[in-house]
Amino acid sequence: MTACFATWQKGRQKLRVANAGQSQPLLYKDGRCGKIDLAGFPLGIFEEVSYDEWGVTLAPGDILVFHSDGIAETANSEGQFFGTERLRKLIEQHHEIGAKEMSDLILREVDWFTQSAPLSDDRTLVILKVR
C-alpha cells in the first residue's frame, strides 16, 4: 500500500511530508511548479524501514498537490499518458484559482484527455493552497 503523510503547522506556515511509495507531490512556489524529490518504499514491503522527511515554509499563494499515479499515468486511446508535465503546466497556468476549482479543473482535463474512457486506476487529488 502506498501513502503520503503530511503535517501542517499553521502558525509557522511549515509543512512536513513523508512519502511511502506514492507519486511525488508537486509544489507551486515563486511562479514555478515542480516535483518534491521525496520517495520511499510502499508500506508493508519491509519489516523495518525509515522514511525521509521533507519540510518547507510556505507563503500565501503557494500550492501543494498530492496526486495518485492514476492522474499522470492515465492514457488516452493512442496510448499517451496524461503525464506529470501536463499536470505541472495546468497548476502553473491556473495558480490563481482556489483549491476546489483547481481539483475540478484537473479532473475535467484528465477526462477530456482520455475521452471519458473507463477508469483503470483511482484518480485521487489533495490540493493545499496557502492563504
Question: Which sequence ranges carry the predicted segments?
Answer:
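Conserved subregion of the PPM/PP2C metallophosphatase catalytic domain
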Residues: 1-131
